[in-house]
Every structure is written in structure tokens, then in C-alpha cells.
Design a protein with these regions (language model features):
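Residue-identity detector for glutamine
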Residues: 11-13, 32-33, 37, 46-47, ...
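Long, charge-dense tracts
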Residues: 36-44, 105, 110, 126-151, ...
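Catalytic centers of nucleases
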Residues: 49-134
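Generic hydrophobic, helix-prone segments enriched in Leu/Val/Ile
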Residues: 45-49, 55, 109-112, 125-129, ...
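Interdomain/boundary linker segments immediately adjacent to catalytic/signaling cores
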Residues: 1-73
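Metal-dependent nuclease catalytic core centered on acidic motifs
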Residues: 135-212
Length: 212
């Protein structure tokens, strides 16, 4: 009976020690996870601080007071996208590095050229894309694409889709824009959904009076 008692005590002690060991491992793992989360948050916050610094000096932003939103939109997109990536421990995938301030691209996403177009109204933004590609005919062929305001992208795609499936629902101005989109696709041998993408913000969100 004594031997059984000793063995039982030893087993209980071993079990308790193992539980303590698991607890310590869990605590250490939690500490490491929290440290990583803190670092991720710090990295993401740095991106937002860079944006704050840029917006905080309007005199150095290209354009007049009414057009500075174009360059603001570029920085908002780059910093917001990078912050989202960094917050979950992924690498930033947007950069201005190696891009001239007046180059045909505004920034790079995953190494690909991106031109940002933020005009007042979806028609104005689409026309700006058409004009840009006339100036740089090989932009798309070299892997480039366009970022436009989220709300305008939704309108553009809605008009495009209704033009394909419910043509009669289009207004006169929407019909004209739809025809221009189809003609542009045929001319460039592309699909709009492949080369035009939404940003994280709407047109109104990048106006200087809003973000200042």
C-alpha cells in the first residue's frame, strides 16, 4: 500500500509539474504574441504618423487649394493600405520609393505601377484615365493600373454592369459613359475591372478641408 501511495504521489507531482510547465509555455507564448501585436501596432501607427506629417504641411502638397486632394489621395491610399498590412504582421506593399513626384505612376503596389485619379465626378475621373493612357500608351502594358475613389468606383462598375444586363435602366449621361467605357476597353484590349481599382476612401474624404 505504501508503494502505491508513493507512486500515486509521484504521479500527482509529475502531473502538477507538467501543468505548471504548460502554463509557463502558454504565458510565454502570450507574451510573445502581445509583443508582436505591440510591434505591429507601432509599425502601423508609424504609417499614419507619416500621413499626418505630410498633410500637416499643405504648402508642400502639389496643386492649388482646390486640387491638392490629388496628392493627398495618393498618400492616404499608400499609408492606409500599409497600415492594414502591418497591423496583422504582413509586409507593407505600397511605396513611393523610386517614384518621381511627377512620374507616370504615383506609387507602387507589389512592385506594380499605380496611377491615382481623383476628379470631381465619375465621368471626370474616367476621362482622366483615358487622357493619362493617351500620354503614356504603354502604362497598362507594363503592368500599370489605376486607383480611383471608392464611391466613384462603385458607380463606375454599377453603370458598366447595368449597361451589360439592364441597358434601359441607364440615364442618358450613364449611357454615354457606358459607351465610352466599352469603346475604351476595345481600343486598349483590356477590361476595366482588371485595370481600375477602388481606393480605401471616397472622393470627399481626401479634400484638404476634411483631412487637414
Amino acid at each position: 500500500m505504501r508503494l502505491i501511495h508513493v507512486l500515486k504521489n509521484n504521479q500527482e507531482q509529475a502531473t502538477a509539474a507538467w501543468i505548471d510547465h504548460l502554463k509557463n509555455l502558454r504565458i510565454e507564448d502570450m507574451i510573445q504574441q502581445l509583443a508582436r501585436q505591440d510591434k505591429n501596432f507601432e509599425n502601423a501607427l508609424q504609417q499614419l504618423n507619416e500621413l499626418k506629417i505630410f498633410i500637416g504641411d499643405p504648402e508642400h502638397i502639389l496643386g492649388s487649394y482646390l486640387t491638392k486632394h490629388g496628392e493627398i489621395a495618393e498618400h492616404v491610399q499608400v499609408r492606409f493600405c500599409n497600415a492594414d498590412k502591418l497591423l496583422v504582421g504582413k509586409a507593407a506593399n505600397h511605396t513611393f520609393e523610386g517614384v518621381g513626384r511627377t512620374a507616370m505612376e504615383d506609387y507602387l503596389r507589389n512592385g506594380k505601377m499605380i496611377q491615382s485619379k481623383f476628379y470631381n465626378g465619375v465621368k471626370g475621373t474616367f476621362n482622366a484615365i483615358v487622357t493619362h493612357l493617351k500620354s503614356y500608351p504603354y502604362f497598362i502594358k507594363k503592368g500599370g493600373s489605376y486607383d480611383i475613389p471608392r464611391d466613384q468606383y462603385e458607380s463606375l462598375i454599377d453603370i458598366y454592369n447595368r449597361g451589360q444586363t439592364a441597358r434601359s435602366s441607364l440615364s442618358r449621361s450613364e449611357e454615354t459613359l457606358f459607351k465610352h467605357m466599352i469603346a475604351w476597353e476595345n481600343e486598349q484590349d483590356v477590361k476595366i475591372c482588371d485595370v481600375v481599382h477602388p481606393t480605401q476612401v471616397d472622393y470627399k474624404d481626401v479634400q484638404l478641408k476634411v483631412v487637414d
